[in-house]
């Protein structure tokens, strides 16, 4: 899964941070439908997980509302969706288990999260984490290829898998009584994966076709690929999750097995169970299925990656393509994540993104779409859920006849205004309420709850960090928002990408036809 989301723009406009493989399975074949979003923007895809311009706010808050601990105002009556707060325990082999009781329906969601993503790949092997995600469906000694997926379908369940820069996860949602079966399958493929060239090489072709379809033939995705590479000069977040084409085509069985043996182990995983169960029911199942799997001693206690130097100058990227119908610009700033930020900074960036770019009352939308109007869309976004520094993004699509320079002048003016002057009290309260309310309205998805606990925990946050998020949002002051804009939205910290129509190529192609 490549996921990060951008408001007002199609999925293909999202920076490639995570590959989501929507898996369609039949008894004879498996087809992977990859989507290329990335973290900060609005999406309307499976699981209902990206409904917000500020996805980090949603992901943390969705978990919070599931526990019933969020209170205040009109949200009070809607927060009691689970019968108990999440429970966490750790097996002797290092497997962390999180149980999220949800008694509304007799179904459960099992998600296993491995603390490894594309940023953990060896240089020259880009796309390996995602490639292995595909191969994890190729069977084990105990269960031949297709049996796991066929079992999920037979019991009326569904499944999915995704790879991001920081993690890889596998998911099943099934009737409650099938949890033990799902757990047995999942534990089995943690150690028993069998890979043969007759399965590996065709699957590599599937991934290459994904790249061709979703990136090579998609101008929006190509631009995002280039922006990310320019933003991250040294950090592996600059590599696309799906990989570079010339490196994907060289990946083989030995690469996949080495990666699997290195990273797929209980002490590098988090098992999240959400649904009509509690810890007392889940623990014996986990111990029976996962307890005997040995830990991998070579896995470090903390992931250490090359970090970015202090940005020294703004950068620009221009992509011209004859298929472009709507020119657009997007600017990404290098900013701290919830894991790397100083106290209060991440929450202030959450609020700043909501203030600047979420909805028709946001500052950018009003300045560019309503007041002028110079653009057909405008937005801003931030995602805190990242092990290392992440991005704050602004985007706009100019109207015909409007230059990028005109649009950027307005964007820069809005940022300067926010950075120099504390925002109005009524605006601050409005966006805080929006952050809370939007998340509450989206809480009715069990898989969402499991996904965002897993995402937060695999990127260095704790359950307490998740549970205390509403209080941190409520505590954000106007001065903190102003300071965040001033400190982090400096032009030198940014890469601006321009997507334009290549009219010369289009004319040459018309002449040839």
Residue ranges and their predicted role:
Residues 139-142, 173-204, 283, 360, ...:
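M16/insulysin-pitrilysin zinc metalloprotease superfamily fold
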Residues 73-111, 116-118, 144-177, 214-267, ...:
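Non-catalytic beta-strand/loop surface segments
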Residues 118-124:
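Short pre-active-site segment immediately N-terminal to the catalytic Zn-binding motif
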Residues 18-21, 59:
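Cysteine-centered motifs
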Residues 40-50:
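Short, Lys/Arg-enriched N-terminal segments with co-localized hydrophobic residues
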Residues 126-140:
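Active-site SXXK
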Residues 59-69:
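Bacterial N-terminal signal peptides
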């Amino acid at each position: 899964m490549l996921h990060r989301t951008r408001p007002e723009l199609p999925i293909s406009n999202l920076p490639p941070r995570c590959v989501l493989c929507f898996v369609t399975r039949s008894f004879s074949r498996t087809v992977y439908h990859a989507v290329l979003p990335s973290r900060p923007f609005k999406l309307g895809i499976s699981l209902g997980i990206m409904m917000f311009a500020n996805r980090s706010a949603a992901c943390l808050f969705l978990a919070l509302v599931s526990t019933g601990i969020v209170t205040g105002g009109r949200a009070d009556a809607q927060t009691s969706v689970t019968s108990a707060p999440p429970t966490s325990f750790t097996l002797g082999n290092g497997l962390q288990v999180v149980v999220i009781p949800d008694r509304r329906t007799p179904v459960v969601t099992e998600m296993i999260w491995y603390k490894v993503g594309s940023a953990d790949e060896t240089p020259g092997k880009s796309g390996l984490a995602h490639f292995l995600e595909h191969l994890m469906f190729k069977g084990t000694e105990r269960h031949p290829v297709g049996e796991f997926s066929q079992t999920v379908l037979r019991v009326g369940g569904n499944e999915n898998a995704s790879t991001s820069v920081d993690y890889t996860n596998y998911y099943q949602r099934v009737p409650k009584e099938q949890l033990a079966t799902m757990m047995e399958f999942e534990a089995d493929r943690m150690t028993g994966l069998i890979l043969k060239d007759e399965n590996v090489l065709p699957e590599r072709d599937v991934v290459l076709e994904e790249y061709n379809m979703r990136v090579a033939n998609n101008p929006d995705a190509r631009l995002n690929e280039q922006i990310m590479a320019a933003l991250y000069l040294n950090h592996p977040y600059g590599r696309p999750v799906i990989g570079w084409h010339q490196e994907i085509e060289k990946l083989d069985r030995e690469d996949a097995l080495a990666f699997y043996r290195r990273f797929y182990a209980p002490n590098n995983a988090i098992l999240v169970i959400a649904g009509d169960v509690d810890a007392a029911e889940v623990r014996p199942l986990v111990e029976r299925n996962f307890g005997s799997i040995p830990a991998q001693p070579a896995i470090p206690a903390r992931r250490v990656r090359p970090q970015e130097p202090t940005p020294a100058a703004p950068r620009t990227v221009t992509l011209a393509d004859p298929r472009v119908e709507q020119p657009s610009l997007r600017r990404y700033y290098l900013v701290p994540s919830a894991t790397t930020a100083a106290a209060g900074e991440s929450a202030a960036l959450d609020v700043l993104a909501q203030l600047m770019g979420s909805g028709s009352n946001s500052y950018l939308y009003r300045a560019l779409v309503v007041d002028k109007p110079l653009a057909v869309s405008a937005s801003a976004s931030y995602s805190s859920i990242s092990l290392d520094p992440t991005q704050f993004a602004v985007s706009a699509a100019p109207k015909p006849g409007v230059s990028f320079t005109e649009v950027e002048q307005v964007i820069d003016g809005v940022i300067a205004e926010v950075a120099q002057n504390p925002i109005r009290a009524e605006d601050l309260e409005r966006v805080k309420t929006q952050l809370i309310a939007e998340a509450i309205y989206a809480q009715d998805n069990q898989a969402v709850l499991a996904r965002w606990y897993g995402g937060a925990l695999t990127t260095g946050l704790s359950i307490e960090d998740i549970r205390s998020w509403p209080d941190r949002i409520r505590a954000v002051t106007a001065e903190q928002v102003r300071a965040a804009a001033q400190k982090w939205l400096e032009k030198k910290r940014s890469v601006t990408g321009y997507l334009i129509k290549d009219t010369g190529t289009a004319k040459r192609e018309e002449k040839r036809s």
